[in-house]
């Protein structure tokens, strides 16, 4: 293990200990089903905004968006309005209404909320919605664990299987221990870390590579083409398909249940500003990082570009 790897390893251990501490603290705050499932409906704007943003973006943003920008070049710019539209849909249309109705109906889960009608609860709808959520989450969680496994594998040389089991064990421990409070606070910490990464690393990369070199690299591409340079209907189809990312945001139950947990509608209005500012920092930052990487490093795995550039440009911690 190199000196740099040792620093990264001890930083990771410290982070895991913080997560366990959050779980222990949250377990003392959890005294009822309402506390466990939606934090007693007491989430403030900062925790709600940052935890919802981080859980909606997580690994696919850090690794996927930067990797797409590295691989695609200029056409990756469309990821930004696509994701930002998802934030607007969630925070301006879904969040206020869901918060108000879930409070008035005293529902704890999204499945329970969806199953309610004027004539009471529809059992079949609750079962169906629960099945859909569980089925889709199998693939979503698998992709998150795979991303974590890739990070461990490339940084420490550990097997992906061991890395996934280790990470899953920590997550399972603090989640079962502290419930929604633990998840929300750990996601808030993740959101802050992501924002710092999206500010610091692209700035350092830009300083290293130079803005002129980035412009020269992507300048030959068209805004209205596919990543392979095809224009016309194919380019329009690519743009529309990419913009479709925003439609998926209201369909993420682990995100919209934050809206149910926010203390009041007024706090929703405050949280939406924080969340949108966060998105404006994160997505352009990751796109810029990917563009800088095209002129700085050669990688067969485009999704590793953030990790590779971080290892080369930043101190180990």
Cite the ranges covered by each PLM segment.
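Hydrophobic alpha-helical segments and their helix-loop junctions in multi-pass secondary transporters
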Residues: 21-22, 26-29, 91, 95, ...
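Loop-to-helix junctions at membrane interfaces in multi-pass transport proteins
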Residues: 2-4, 38-43, 64-81, 115, ...
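Helix-loop-helix module between adjacent transmembrane segments
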Residues: 78-175, 241-248, 294
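Juxtamembrane interface elements at the cytosolic ends of transmembrane helices
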Residues: 18-33, 89-111, 145, 173, ...
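Extracellular loop-to-transmembrane helix junctions
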Residues: 3-27, 43, 68-112, 194, ...
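Membrane-water interface regions at transmembrane-helix termini and the short interhelical loops
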Residues: 68-72, 97, 147-155, 168-191, ...
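Membrane-interface "cap" regions at the ends of multi-pass membrane proteins
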Residues: 1-62, 175-178, 191, 197-203, ...
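Transmembrane-helix boundary/entry motifs in multi-pass membrane transporters
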Residues: 37-54, 96, 100-135, 263-266, ...
């Amino acid at each position: 293990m190199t000196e740099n790897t040792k620093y990264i390893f001890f930083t990771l251990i410290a982070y895991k200990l913080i997560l366990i501490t959050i779980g222990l603290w949250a377990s003392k705050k959890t005294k009822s089903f309402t506390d466990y499932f939606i934090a007693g409906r007491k989430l403030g704007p900062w925790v709600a905004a940052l935890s919802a943003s981080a859980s909606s973006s997580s690994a696919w943003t850090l690794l996927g968006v930067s990797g797409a920008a590295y691989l695609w070049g200029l056409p990756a710019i469309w990821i930004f309005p696509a994701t930002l539209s998802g934030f607007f849909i969630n925070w301006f249309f879904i969040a206020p209404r869901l918060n108000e109705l879930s409070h008035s109906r005293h529902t704890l889960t999204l499945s329970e909320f969806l199953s309610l009608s004027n004539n009471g609860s529809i059992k079949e709808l609750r079962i169906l919605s629960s099945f859909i959520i569980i089925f889709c989450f199998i693939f979503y969680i698998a992709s998150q664990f795979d991303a974590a496994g890739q990070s461990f594998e490339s940084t420490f040389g550990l097997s992906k299987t061991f890395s996934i089991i280790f990470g899953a064990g920590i997550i399972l421990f603090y989640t079962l221990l502290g419930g929604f409070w633990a998840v929300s606070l750990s996601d808030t910490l993740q959101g802050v870390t992501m924002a710092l990464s999206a500010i610091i690393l692209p700035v350092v990369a830009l300083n290293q590579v130079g803005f002129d070199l980035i412009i020269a690299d992507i300048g030959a591409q068209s805004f209205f083409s596919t990543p392979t340079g095809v224009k016309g209907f194919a380019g329009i189809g690519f743009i529309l398909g990419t913009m479709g990312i925003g439609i998926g945001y209201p369909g993420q139950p682990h995100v919209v249940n934050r809206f149910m947990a926010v203390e009041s509608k007024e706090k929703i209005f405050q949280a939406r500003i924080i969340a949108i500012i966060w998105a404006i920092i994160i997505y352009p930052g990751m796109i810029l990082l990917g563009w800088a990487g095209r002129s700085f490093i050669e990688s067969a795995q485009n999704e590793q570009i953030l990790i590779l550039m971080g290892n080369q440009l930043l101190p180990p911690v």
